[in-house]
Amino acid sequence: MSKKILKDVSRNRKERPWRERKLENLQYAEYLRILNFKKANRVKECGEVLRFVADDEGRLRLYQTWFCKSRLCPLCNWRRSMGQSNQLMQVLDEAHKQRKTGRFLFLTLTAENASGENLKQEVRKMGRAISKLFQYKKPAKNLLGYVRSTEITINKNGTYHQHMHVLLFVKPTYFKDSANYINQAEWSKLWQRAMKLDYQPIVNVEAVRSNKAKGKNSLIASAQETAKYQVKSKDILTNDQERDLQVVEDLEQGLAGSRQISYGGLFKEIRKQLQLEDVDAHLINVDDDKVKIDEVVREVVAKWDYNKQNYFIW
């Protein structure tokens, strides 16, 4: 009797991409092996066996597996992004309950491209600068809370574009007058000062509006942008092995010890109030699928078949 291929479907009937992420994970693990990273075997074993509970309608919920938690692992990053997005939406909902008149802004902060050699230094510099930015008088007087994430994109010439996405929660007085409102040019000058740059950096700021009548509102879109992958898998797995190996080596070293996402002000306080723990500690329970399995009728075990390149039910 042939084994069935795993099919794990979300609440909105979209199949979860276990196979795609595992194939990417194996390619990443192979690059680590070639580069002589000690964690290569550990990464390869990520998510080999998935244990689910199922109800009488066949709905699955992951309850046990082992994730490598490597920063660039496509399988872990997929779970991590879901968990971060889920946590962030909880924080935003609570923030709006506590400060109903608060408004949201989406701020993107950039700097000149970095080489692989100085990427780590530039990422750390941005982390220090953003704390300084929000201590300046004009941003601080209306800022209630924020969440920021660092994203790295890879340029065709082998350099890296490091930038930050910041979701700000501000008092309504931010929009009152020129003494409170900070336009894009001012944000650029403030960021230049915080980063100690000899050029004016490109920044983008826009008000975030919740318009549920038009489907996905801009607050949800901004939250998802903030909580997304630090580095997209397609940027490090291009089938150009020489190029990919250099990128993996640069990013492994450049991102070591850095925080992908962090909270400040009211958002940080709310995370403590909600007792939200580090997402990496809970890559199993990250789903935003609220369908509760009321009656577990069986366990479903799926194992990765290295020959057939897929998960099969055992």
UniProtKB/Swiss-Prot annotation:
Give the protein name, as stated in the record: Protein rep
An individual GO BP term: DNA replication
Reported function? Produces a single-strand nick in a specific site of the plasmid, and this nick results in single-strand replication by rolling circle mechanism.
Q: Which domain of life is it from?
A: Bacteria
The UniProt annotation places DNA binding at Y229
Family named by the database record: Belongs to the Gram-positive plasmids replication protein type 1 family.
Keywords attached to this entry: DNA replication, Plasmid
A GO term for molecular function = DNA binding
